[in-house]
Amino acid sequence: MSDLFAKLMDQIEMPLDMRRSSAFSSADIIEVKVHSVSRLWEFHFAFAAVLPIATYRELHDRLIRTFEAADIKVTFDIQAAQVDYSDDLLQAYYQEAFEHAPCNSASFKSSFSKLKVTYENDKLIIAAPRFVNNDHFRKNHLPNLVKQLEAFGFGTLTIDMVSDQEMTEHLTKDFVSSRQALVKKAVQDNLEAQKSLEAMMPPVEEATPAPKFDYKERAAKRQAGFEKATITPMIEIETEENRIVFEGMVFDVERKTTRTGRHIINFKMTDYTSSFALQKWAKDDEELRKFDMIAKGAWLRVQGNIETNPFTKSLTMNVQQVKEIVHHERKDLMPEGQKRVELHAHTNMSTMDALPTVESLIDTAAKWGHKAVAITDHANVQSFPHGYHRARKAGIKAIFGLEANIVEDKAPISYDPVDMDLHEATYVVFDVETTGLSAMNNDLIQIAASKMFKGNIVEQFDEFIDPGHPLSAFTTELTGITDKHLQGAKPLVTVLKAFQDFCKDSILVAHNASFDVGFMNANYERHDLPKITQPVIDTLEFARNLYPEYKRHGLGPLTKRFQVSLDHHHMANYDAEATGRLLFIFLRDAREKHGIKNLLQLNTDLVAEDSYKKARIKHATIYVQNQVGLKNMFKLVSLSNIKYFEGVPRIPRTVLDAHREGLLLGTACSDGEVFDAVLTKGIDAAVDLAKYYDFIEIMPPAIYQPLVVRELIKDQAGIEQVIRDLIEVGKRANKPVLATGNVHYLEPEEEIYREIIVRSLGQGAMINRTIGRGEGAQPAPLPKAHFRTTNEMLDEFAFLGKDLAYQVVVENTQDFADRIEEVEVVKGDLYTPYIDKAEETVAELTYQKAFEIYGNPLPDIIDLRIEKELTSILGNGFAVIYLASQMLVNRSNERGYLVGSRGSVGSSFVATMIGITEVNPMPPHYVCPSCQHSEFITDGSVGSGYDLPNKPCPKCGTPYQKDGQDIPFETFLGFDGDKVPDIDLNFSGDDQPSAHLDVRDIFGDEYAFRAGTVGTVAEKTAYGFVKGYERDYGKFYRDAEVDRLAAGAAGVKRTTGQHPGGIVVIPNYMDVYDFTPVQYPADDVTASWQTTHFNFHDIDENVLKLDILGHDDPTMIRKLQDLSGIDPITIPADDPGVMALFSGTEILGVTPEQIGTPTGMLGIPEFGTNFVRGMVNETHPTTFAELLQLSGLSHGTDVWLGNAQDLIKEGVATLKTVIGCRDDIMVYLMHAGLEPKMAFTIMERVRKGLWLKISEEERNGYIDAMRENNVPDWYIESCGKIKYMFPKAHAAAYVLMALRVAYFKVHHPIMYYCAYFSIRAKAFELKTMSDGLDAVKARMEDITIKRKNNEATNVENDLFTTLEIVNEMLERGFKFGKLDLYKSDAIEFQIKGDTLIPPFIALEGLGENVAKQIVKARQEGEFLSKMELRKRGGASSTLVEKMDEMGILGNMPEDNQLSLFDDFF
């Protein structure tokens, strides 16, 4: 053994007997590689032989543990002089391999770790079942096994797999039997569920006759048989069968037409035992119409044969007969005026917990004849706006509430404290063990205590108590106490009296004292003994306040941290003694660190201001009683999310008290404090707490059933007794008792959807904590929480007697609903912020600019347009919106950035004049920059002013300026000019954060908020949840059932977020709580902006919303301006060179073959995608107007494909005449002779895809008017195909930006390529890019092949786009340089003559921070070694190696050598 190796063995304290083994005789350290940045040490050992497996594991574990203490990761491998290939040793190491990455992947380990291995003919042979002996494992996993065995010292082995028939048959048999058991259990479970569902149905009504078809006589008997056929539950079908009959609901339908004209209806049905895929063929349209009843939501009876679908490989019914059936929905059968009101209902806005939309909840209550229904989502009010609108529509009162998380502001450390010296006090530190957590329903089985003085135990108390019944397995497992411990124990009352004597003249101490003291007091009260009145210290709260930096303050973690012995946690005597030891550590630290000497100081001086963060949460339901209450509710929600958020939104009790006006409080569910007090402290304690509330909630016994499983309540009788106790609490506290349903879904069969959603949260969620331990441990079942009718609710409470049940279910809930006033949740008007003299300023800026361009007096056409627009803008209070946008654009312009407009704002000439948009919506015209003379073309013959021929002003000879896109104002603010303006602006991505801050600066921090969004579970995500549930809970679902469950679980709120550029501005004469609560996005309390709590769409017609979006175009323009010094405003929109790009490549000096495309569109915004390039190739645009058409066609839906494209190909129309942008419809129809109002209405119907959805009468009226004015039929037919259209103003703004970029591509190419790669390129491969044309083209060909085979990754697709531009640049004679350690910038590409030098950030895996660090470090001095580059430059070893491979580092030396133990520890 070498000295160095021996030193290492001493360091890791390797056992001497192992060190003396023969394997260690010549042990040595061959090499150590030290990676300082990653703190990884690689050891390479030499041994005489392969180590015994126990020795290897000991060496491995001690190395890891020792170096972990110094925050160093360790790996090692072994070279063995002699290798023993005995089966036992090989088998042991083979199994050990699966404990090491990457062999420990789940699929490899589960399939291979238990297999047998042998060594034969110089090969390691693995005997495997046939189904794992495949190429996947051979290719992806066996090489890893070879490497791991080599690291163990076996050298490079050849591994082969052989199929073991016996093993294959055995495992197959086990799998089949396990699967059959799963299916059998699923069948039984679902059949029972169906029986339960049927039992809840109201009496069957006589079915309405199904629609009859003219079948031939010979089908009559078959139809009769169909009517009487036995219905088969879907769950029972496992194989192909004939003439099966199902009844169920259709939940998915897809209709297709084959090339031969036949139709196929693929649909899915469920009967709630399972689901099935079905298909029905129809030979023609007439037969297809017979099956219109196959629609989503329809209930059908179907008969057909079950066959395996050759495409989906799933069992599918080929339907032969189908008829619609009556589905008997649940109804509330109580008479009018005798129906309950549900006051505790969750919607899908209760995060990952409830299913119904607020609309469906309200619709169900209204359908049942209920006069009101409450919304009580968990800690949020995001369903309020939709609930408000739906309730008004349904004619039902919506009661707006929430289920809040209430906490005490400062949970006390000491109860009933007195003036007492802590150092001189005597303490009784006690603990109790019980059969459950309920003092009223469970029993004491042990009381133990240590009496302590100055840190010493002076006396002990330890008594078991016989509860009079056998202990449950759970209690024994948790506490370690058995029935044997309790034999011969003293009676409870004797122990209680003895313990009271033991505790005299002392301070009581317990960990989580509220539980122990509550349990003791409940038992004292039950036996007429005095309750605890002496001071109590809770060591749990003591620890939380003394050591807030600790994450866990349970007894177990604390004893480990302070090295206090706790041998038998959950036995009272051991827990009490350990708690006592901790107490005196706490007292010492409190005295030394905080000066705490007196008992009174614990609460006054030590309890932290933010102790609410650790306080135990209790639920309460809060309801809005009036408009004042609504605003207070919004404030509470805001405070709970902004100021008091800790894991969940919390409302401290004092905060609730300060905002309680206009609110009513209920005691909520089993997580409420009154229910908890009844369960754990007794009725007296519950009465005291109940006085704080306005009513007591009781829920159906089924809701409390999980408490029985968790052993908090003994049985059904125990649940009923708790409910009676709650009623007694209400009586004694003089509070009404109301029966609520805790609704989480509407129908009983929807329970499974909630189950899937909740279980997807994993065991970290409280609701999923398992009962018991071990493999069989499962979470408690979820309660039956569907929306119950009055009859169902009365049945649930029948045990109370008819009169009392009716009182709590009907009378009291109706009375409460009557106390609630109607409130306005969403305001009916727009409230814009106030800017002094906004109207005057907008008008002044408009006329000032108009006079500057068009002269004074203005041309009539300009004057009339301005007057028309200002009348609308100023008259409807929109001036402040215009002015705010102008101020934002102006500020960004002053910082050197252009701002592009989006949407239809370019339809407003006032917006153009005050600088919001560059788009001029007037008809095409000339205007003289010198004398302001102008000429307007108003006959529609010219599509864009930029296409007018150049000519001089006839008055002064100055060359005319050209402008005007002919866009009507109506497309922005509606025909009457009263639509709230939606001004969307494209700021440079670099300047967007500054623009956002400008809003705050203009309007004030307290009035500007990011527009909030709500993220829900997508159906694909829900599909994953279903598959996870299926896996984790031993379920087996066919594909159609998975689809149904995924659809049912989708739509539930999962998180919140923010619009990428939306800023909501609250009027400065109101506050945000007049409109919405506020919060942080995704509960990120470190976020710099607060968001609206409501989805911004819910209030976008009430407050100003500014869309300040980030976009690459303004950033690119700024970059080009910085590189060239050219003002982009001066770039002409009709440059011949730029227009030549759209017809060929000659202007670039290359051929189409060189760059792989027939035009010069590569890298041009709006026109560079494959789709638009194809459109350009087909249409050959030559004018700005035609480019606008292309932009509109490419952004619309069903405007180009199957529409304009065909018209152009067939020669029916041209690019100029087809419908391209929405505004063109109105302009064209007015030029054709239609009235402006009708032209506008037709445009609106077409652009929204409503042409075929409006009534035939309305549509025919439009068609007649168009034909009367000679509008061609092809135009009318084209209107009917359109689903969505792009605004012309949006197209004009985008095209104008694109042409400016294109100008640089043509006239200043190296600058264009520099800007493109700096800003737009998403992926780089620097070695390929700098290796020249051949390398670039070869890589492009490689990716092209992968694309054809659908093998290209997203990164490769992005890279291909980059390489297209690189290829074009190189073909044009420019060069792409290598990354240079001393010349490259961190972020931007650099121009060196005709060469581009890439920045550091272009290197894969090198982020912005490291790039900036390298540039900063090189300014401080040359890098002398790779180690220095890693240390000073912050580059990882991987990045340094990559730079070295690319030749960037030249001959830079390697890392400095380190001694093995330098810097160790």
UniProtKB/Swiss-Prot annotation:
One of its GO terms (cellular component) is cytoplasm. The keyword Methyltransferase does not apply. Its EC number is 2.7.7.7. Residues 427-583 form the Exonuclease domain. GO terms for biological process: DNA-templated DNA replication. Its main location: cytoplasm. Keywords: Cytoplasm, DNA replication, DNA-directed DNA polymerase, Exonuclease, Hydrolase, Nuclease, Nucleotidyltransferase, Transferase. It comes from the Bacteria. GO terms for molecular function: 3'-5' exonuclease activity; DNA binding; DNA-directed DNA polymerase activity. The keyword Metal-binding does not apply. It is found in: Cytoplasm. It catalyses: DNA(n) + a 2'-deoxyribonucleoside 5'-triphosphate = DNA(n+1) + diphosphate. Gene3D superfamilies: 1.10.150.870, 3.30.1900.20, 6.10.140.1510, Metal-dependent hydrolases, Nucleic acid-binding proteins, PolC, middle finger domain, Ribonuclease H-like superfamily/Ribonuclease H. InterPro entries: DNA_pol3_alpha_NTPase_dom, DNA_pol3_finger, DNA_PolC-like_N_II, DNA_PolC-type_N_I, DnaE2/DnaE/PolC, DNAPol_HHH, DnaQ, Exonuclease_RNaseT/DNA_pol3. Required for replicative DNA synthesis. This DNA polymerase also exhibits 3' to 5' exonuclease activity. Belongs to the DNA polymerase type-C family. PolC subfamily. HAMAP family: DNApol_PolC. This is DNA polymerase III PolC-type. It comes from Streptococcus pyogenes serotype M5 (strain Manfredo). The gene is polC.
